[in-house]
UniProtKB/Swiss-Prot annotation:
It catalyses: 2 reduced [nitric oxide reductase rubredoxin domain] + NAD(+) + H(+) = 2 oxidized [nitric oxide reductase rubredoxin domain] + NADH. It comes from Escherichia coli O6:K15:H31 (strain 536 / UPEC). PANTHER family: NITRITE REDUCTASE [NAD(P)H] (PTHR43429:SF3), PYRIDINE NUCLEOTIDE-DISULFIDE OXIDOREDUCTASE DOMAIN-CONTAINING (PTHR43429). This is Nitric oxide reductase FlRd-NAD(+) reductase. One of at least two accessory proteins for anaerobic nitric oxide (NO) reductase. Reduces the rubredoxin moiety of NO reductase.
Length: 377
């Protein structure tokens, strides 16, 4: 009798994989194990919950029970996997164990929290569960400090500002979105955030936090202090690799997989935010969707390599939305930037005048798909 496929995790990657497997095979045994409730929600919505007045439970799209019934699964929610015996093909928790033929790690990534004194006062918004734990504090907060001016930090800063809160955004870089694009490209969004009232503290660093009678005192570099009611870390994600490491799998930044999503063990695969695909960590929806389609085929014996096309990344800042694609972080590109009231088109070209990256905003976002077709890969 087949032990089937066991998937550890229940987020977007795991669900996309289940749906793709069931399109091809209605009966192969599928087991999902995860530490959370396994209810489905759209993770990108977490960047907009405050301005839209949503509670954590409002985000639920489908309960775990409904998902299990629809796709013929065995689910084990609120279950921590403690070990994987790769040789015996067994997954273990404190009170249970499961045999598998093929195992998929879809354990996601956790929010990085700066290691400063008072770090226990820092909130993260990387899951519905995390939002549920702090939604009352965030709803009641008048003054909010967001640590990290990347994609998520910029989205959160705009959302909290739109909700009428006093927002301070701090980052040690000289501009927002510094790991994604040069300052001459991000300056349009940076200016819009400032116009809205976001207080930007760039080239600045959080050094510590302390609870006070009236809030939280944040100590910054250069002997500066501000008092706020809530502090949120948006300083990046770290792939969850501890379980894979204990199983003896090859780990770098994430769980290392090849073009077939296969780890260093032939019967164990990794998918989503925890995976490092041929040296790349790609924590975006489109590569996860494409990876899930390919992995479903591979698990069912139809070996197919993953080939990722040029893909759009969307920055969901409603007052000034952006789409970007290509190698926007490359230092050697020359940028041609065209701005007008309706939006911006920024093209990054190499020494051969080949288009290597672009960023478009607002009404000019309709040009994104045309530019995508001309992007040199």
């Amino acid at each position: 009798m087949s032990n089937g496929i066991v998937i550890i995790g229940s987020g977007f990657a795991a669900r996309q994989l289940v749906k793709n497997i069931r399109k091809q095979d209605a009966s192969i045994p599928l087991t999902l194990i995860a530490a959370d409730s396994m209810d489905e929600y759209n993770k990108p919505d977490l960047s907009h919950v405050i301005s839209q007045g949503q509670r954590a439970d409002d985000l639920t799209r489908q309960t775990a029970g409904e998902f299990a019934e629809q796709f013929n699964l065995r689910l084990f929610p609120h279950t921590w996997v403690t070990d994987i015996d790769a040789e015996a093909h067994v997954v273990k928790s404190q009170n249970n164990q499961w045999q598998y033929d093929k195992l998929v790690l879809a354990t996601g990534a956790s929010a990085f929290v700066p290691p400063v004194p008072g770090r226990e006062l820092i909130l993260t918004l990387n899951s519905q569960q995390e939002y549920r734990a702090c939604e009352t504090q965030l709803r009641d907060a008048r003054r909010v400090l967001i640590v990290g001016g990347g994609l998520i930090g910029s989205e959160l800063a705009m959302d909290f500002c739109r909700a009428g809160k006093a927002v301070t955004l701090i980052d040690n870089a000289a501009s927002i979105l510094a790991s994604l694009m040069p300052p001459e490209v991000s300056s349009r969004l940076q200016h819009r955030l400032t116009e809205m009232g976001v207080h930007l503290l760039l080239k600045s660093q959080l050094q510590g936090l302390e609870k006070t009678d009236s809030g939280i005192l944040a100590t910054l570099d250069r002997q500066r202090c501000i008092e706020v009611d809530a502090v949120i870390a948006a300083t990046g994600l770290r792939p969850e690799t501890a379980l894979a490491r204990r199983a003896g799998l090859t780990i770098n930044r994430g769980v290392c997989v090849d073009s077939y999503l296969q780890t260093s063990n032939a019967d164990i695969y990794a998918l989503g935010d925890c995976a490092e695909i041929n040296g790349q960590v790609l924590p975006f929806l489109q590569p996860i969707q494409l990876s899930a389609m390919v992995l479903a085929k591979n698990l069912l014996g139809n070996n197919t390599p993953l080939k990722l096309p040029a893909m759009l990344v969307k920055i969901k800042t409603p007052e000034l939305p952006l789409h970007l694609a290509g190698e926007t972080q490359r230092q050697d590109l020359r940028w041609h930037i065209y701005t007008e009231r309706q939006g911006m088109v920024a093209r990054g070209v190499d020494d051969a005048d080949q288009l290597r990256a672009f960023v478009v905003s607002e009404d000019r976002m309709k040009e994104a798909f045309g530019l995508l077709k001309t992007l040199s890969m």
